[in-house]
Amino acid sequence: MREVISVHIGQGGIQVGNACWELFCLEHGIQPDGQMPSDKTIGGGDDAFNTFFSETGAGKHVPRAVLVDLEPTVCDEIRTGTYRQLFHPEQIISGKEDAANNFARGHYTIGKEIVDLVLDRIRKLADNCTGLQGFIGFHSVGGGTGSGLGSLLLERLSVDYGKKSKLCFTVYPSPQVSTAVVEPYNSVLSTHSLLEHTDVAVMLDNEAVYDICRRNLDIERPTYTNLNRLIAQVISSLTASLRFDGALNVDITEFQTNLVPYPRIHFMLSSYGPVISAEKAYHEQLSVAEITNSSFEPASMMAKCDPRHGKYMACCMMFRGDVVPKDVNAAVATIKTKRTIQFVDWSPGFKVGINYQPPTVVPGGDLAKVMRAVCMISNSTAIAEVFSRIDHKFDLMYAKRAFVHWYVGEGMEEGEFSEAREDLAALEKDYEEVGIETAEGEGEEEDMAQ
């Protein structure tokens, strides 16, 4: 089996995780107590969903996941919530004091006390796997736990499981919506280690997802539950090929191979379509071409940046439901002819996966049940916009050394700030260089021909 272990860190990571496991359970017909009436093989079984769930002798399905937070509230919600029987109590780990939006607390003082316990639990899950494929991390980098403990865990996982791939779903601070003043510090410090210790990081940002909920689902004031359920659809589409048997299946390592041209350039943009409310879906069933086009719209992007300002280096489209390769090829061909969607000249660009399992929606949720959906995850130079925005905010505060004493007081050195900031400046430069026309001399002749 090619198992995957999910690691949910901090409030953001756990709440996105909640939405994901809720959706996975629905997709596989697993009840909140872990029973799965449709599953006839008791025990390990070689069913595809066993990549994400392990089976006990009693026929209970337990997510291969660890949920960690430095303060107990969010974990307690799970311990008392609908899915309280789904997780093994040891998989939910909570500390007693908060990281208080402080990277240094999550990474040095408080995180250090809990990290060995977490790694021990992960080791138990790993021992339970026959062929561990890798890890999927869920966290946000604005707060203290997701950024600090998140980076610490990723660093330690690199040491313990060097060759296993690590895919991260990372919620970045939004341009307008801010939950903490020190978000830029935490994000920059955290990205510094994401650069080294993850293979692929999918960037999400609350504001972009808010706008999608508001615009496409007519939700006037979206809650985190609305946002997380939409994000869960993206994560579900990306992992569907690991959890179901399909025609064109995609492995975690395959994402990496197809999306990352250079090790540092591994921050991905994602989008999902169709996002329509139940009332609208009643009147329209969207074709493959339509959902493909909509997934390239700047408004569909789950991070605030405009792909029209950048070039695509690679693009992975995961279709699910009633989709045949012929339609996909036609849709992709149309995309390639569009002038607004530019690829770098050294990369042909598309990888496609098809999974015949139709998309599932949470009953009573906002999303409509549709026949087919697509999730696009792409590597575009436009994502540098996200970094430059955060870097700019970082610079404004750091020039005055505002709030820095909180970090230094928790055992960080001021040098780490400038080191992380320089690393990000280098990353912005890397993105710039990748986008510049590579084959010089050839470009001019092509212009003449046009």
UniProtKB/Swiss-Prot annotation:
Binding of Mg(2+), residues: 71
Stored SUPFAM superfamilies: Tubulin C-terminal domain-like (SSF55307), Tubulin nucleotide-binding domain-like (SSF52490)
Keywords from the named record: Acetylation, Cytoplasm, Cytoskeleton, GTP-binding, Hydrolase, Magnesium, Metal-binding, Microtubule, Nucleotide-binding
Catalytic center residues: 254
SMART domains (alphabetical): Tubulin (SM00864), Tubulin_C (SM00865)
Main EC class the enzyme belongs to: hydrolase
Catalytic activity: GTP + H2O = GDP + phosphate + H(+)
Pfam family, one: Tubulin
A biological process term (GO) from this entry: microtubule-based process
Nucleotide-binding keyword on record: yes
Reported modifications of this chain: Acetylation of alpha chains at Lys-40 stabilizes microtubules and affects affinity and processivity of microtubule motors. This modification has a role in multiple cellular functions, ranging from cell motility, cell cycle progression or cell differentiation to intracellular trafficking and signaling.
PTM annotation (N6-acetyllysine): residues: 40
Family per record: Belongs to the tubulin family.
Free-text function comment from the UniProt entry: Tubulin is the major constituent of microtubules, a cylinder consisting of laterally associated linear protofilaments composed of alpha- and beta-tubulin heterodimers. Microtubules grow by the addition of GTP-tubulin dimers to the microtubule end, where a stabilizing cap forms. Below the cap, tubulin dimers are in GDP-bound state, owing to GTPase activity of alpha-tubulin.
Protein's name in the database: Tubulin alpha chain
Lineage of origin: Eukaryota, Sar, Alveolata, Ciliophora, Intramacronucleata
